[in-house]
A protein has these predicted regions:
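Short Cys/His-rich "knuckle" micro-motifs
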Residues: 193-195
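Local cysteine-cluster metal-coordination motifs and their immediate loop/turn environment
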Residues: 94, 167-191
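ATP-dependent adenylation/nucleotidyltransferase module used to activate substrates
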Residues: 1-162
Length: 195
């Protein structure tokens, strides 16, 4: 098998920046794909991704995919439940496979973690396994190195590989340039950082 050359799906959030930093440290990072799908937090999240790429001299590929639904829909606990774009990772991984092939990469790396699996079917081991089987038809592997980690463990890994936590964005419900502190993403991040 040839040496790993990864394309990371980079949102600018803690998880994706952590996997990008992991691949960079291993000298296996070929490029990052930054996707604007109309997410309400794009104004703050995407600059974090772009800045990370610039800081580390990593090729940043950009895609605009507004058809994914932007703000998405709520699941779970009514209006207070997590916001999701149904099948977002399915679409992003598909884009990633295409971009990987065009840009000479043989793997797509995603930042899914164990805490994501309850609310997001496309962050589960079974999904990543199936996506990998499909992508392998094109000679591209799908990797999710954080899949067995809780958000707290991701923070530990982020610190271990040198991620500047303050340079990442996790809020899905910003009311300005500061995180809301109350959305699911903010709560998970705060809990993980509290230890």
């Amino acid at each position: 098998m040839s040496a790993l050359r990864a394309l990371v799906l980079l949102s600018g959030g803690l998880d994706s920046v952590t996997v990008a930093q992991m691949m960079l440290r291993r000298n296996e990072l070929g490029a990052c794909l930054i996707v604007d799908y109309g997410q309400p937090h794009a104004r703050w999240e995407i600059p974090c991704a772009i800045n990370w790429c610039g800081k580390h001299a990593v090729k940043a590929l950009h895609a605009d995919v507004p058809m994914l639904g932007g703000g998405g829909m709520r699941i779970g606990h009514g209006a207070a439940g997590p916001r999701v774009v149904p099948g977002r990772n399915l679409a992003l991984i598909s884009l990633g496979v295409s971009a990987a092939l065009v840009h000479g990469c043989n793997a797509v790396v995603v930042g899914c973690n164990a805490d994501d699996a309850a609310d997001y079917p496309d962050c589960r081991v079974s999904f990543i396994t199936a996506a990998n089987a499909t992508a392998m038809a094109y000679g591209v592997r799908i990797l999710a190195p954080l899949l067995g980690m809780t958000k707290r463990q991701v923070v530990g890994e982020a610190l271990r590989v040198g991620v500047v936590i303050e340079d990442t964005w996790s809020c899905y419900e910003p009311r300005g340039p500061a995180p809301c502190g109350t959305c699911n993403a903010c709560r998970l991040r705060a809990a993980a950082l509290s230890t």
